[in-house]
Amino acid sequence: MILIFGGTTEGRIAIQTLEEAGKTFYYSTKGDEQDVLLHNGIRLQGAMDAIEIETFCAQHHIKLLIDAAHPFATQLHETLEQVSVESNIPVIRFERIFPKRDEEHITWCRDYDDAIEKIQKEKIFILLALTCVQTIGKLKPLWQNACCYFRILDRDSSRKLAREQGFSEKNLYYYTPGEDEQVLMKQLHPEAILLKESGISGGFCEKVEAARQLGIRIFAICRPKTSGKFICVNGEHGLRRIVEKHLPDFFPLRSGLTTGTCAAAAAVAATWDVFNIYFKKRPTEFPVVLPNGETIQVPVEPQHHIPHSDLLENGDGMFETSATVIKDAGDDPDITNGMKVVANIAIPFRIDDPLPEDTPQDDYNIIVCGGEGVGVITMPGLGLELGSSAINDTPREMIKKNVKLWLERLHIAKQPNPILITISIPGGEEIAKRTFNPRLGIEGGISIIGTSGIVKPFSSEAFINSIRKSMEVAKATQSPRIVISSGAKSERFIKAYYPDLPTQAFVHYGNFIGETLKIAAEEQVPHVTLGVMMGKAVKLAEGNLDTHSKKVTMNKEFIQDLARQTGCSEETLAAIGQMNLARELWDIIPEELLEKFGKALIELCHRHCAPLLPNGELTILLITENGKIYS
């Protein structure tokens, strides 16, 4: 059993993550003002001290604690550390993602006392504190001797707490969700603002940018240090992976890593190796920042290649080494599971090269390419140049970003010499023969195409069960509409189309469109929107309700017939016959016929899907690669 301490955005994410398991857990908040939806979770309210938490854990067989409270909830953090030590229960600290500290534009303060001292020293008379109502008492020396305004949440408990701390209500202003941060600053004209280092989800970046644009000084209190006894994560994927590690039976299937994430980890390890001038022992795992911004730890294989340099007679040389990660796809039946993902780093140099400080650069020159076992693009339509490595933009940028972050962490100066990262998959060429890659024009190896960095475990039964759980949660929100889409990419576009719907109202169907609609019908969902991209739409329009490539492939003749009916020329029909991927249709169909073709495609999809939702209203949206929506 798991007990979450929340009350924050991170608490909500923790709920959503654990709900995927379909098992009971507990969610505790100090007050009752956070509105959260729990389907499998049980809500607890009211503060608990260490003894009360220990007693609860013993009575309810709690094996794992999740601290998803605010970064500045120091009393709770300390209490959970005490409980962890005395009860031998691990604590996962769900941290926020924090931007790099801006030393140029922000005056950083160690704590509240340091903030008071620095603000008073600067003789700031008009101050806007965006530090929450609980800090009013801590900052009393400031508002006793200057004009201070506090922005707080618009609720009775906050007003009561402000009064109890002796603060004048006329200097209180209330947070309005969605309001531009500049509005209040323009109204009050403060000389400075005071912030807490509350992270990206706490709106820290928006507050800083608003103040900078208005020329207002910025003071920020550094977040408290996290206990070294906690296991730290800062996102949903990392949280799930740690839960899977400590409670292997909690989730029905174990998540895994994409090839791109493995490649990024190997590239980071190789970067560490090549600059390890003091020959320290290499860590057993390295951090990788995923496309969603969170960081996870990825195990790497023991070091077998010592960095070396080769020098030719003409003065050209090369620093070079490599590192390996064994791909772990979790419980997903991934054909590449268990394969080696190797990253080689090579940095060319000349003996007479100028020093980096003599040739300052704006950024590192990092080049990513494929080696042994990584396919080469031989046909158009995949969004990559002919002859280039089959590494999509997302994993390519993830590799570059993580290498860059590690170079900065090692204080390596930016220099004009390129840093070449070559990704190899030994055995990839043979494995690729058992995939659709050759048919798509990817020759000589596998493709690295992941978009999230994480492999969600897939089996028909387990995935359909997860759809059912998600649908039950979505219905419980009482959302006026439930939106189903294939995955993260299409969901991102369709969320912008329905900005007011709760997060839980969006359900992933993967490839199981038919099963998802049947579940929606069983749950008596009145309004369903189906978001679909071209690749699945052309299969669905033909009546294939399971769109997995192993079950059904794109029927070019069917698409040509549809295109002919919508007025496309013989030249266009011939181009359709030569395409490799359905998404090429966005470029093949003439722009003036796209809407007509899209409507015809949607109509066919609706004809096959509507009978599965006999008592509900079905809306189908066709989504382009760039997020444009046809209805």
Feature map (PLM): residue ranges:
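Generic N-terminal targeting/processing segments that precede catalytic cores or assembly contacts
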Residues: 250-412, 417-434, 438
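Glycine/small-residue-rich loop that forms an oxyanion/phosphate-binding "nest" at active or ligand-binding sites
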Residues: 64-115
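Glycine-rich, highly charged phosphate/nucleotide-binding loops
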Residues: 41-57, 172-180
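N-terminal beta-loop-helix "entrance" segment that forms/cooperates
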Residues: 26-48, 103-106, 159-165, 295-300
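Short, polar loop motifs at secondary-structure junctions
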Residues: 27-35, 94-99, 133-136, 153-157, ...
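A structural signal for small-residue-enriched, beta-sheet-centric alpha/beta enzyme cores
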Residues: 254-257, 440, 446, 451-599, ...
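A C-terminal functional module that forms or caps the active site or interfaces directly
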Residues: 163-214, 219-223
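Anionic-ligand binding region
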Residues: 129-173
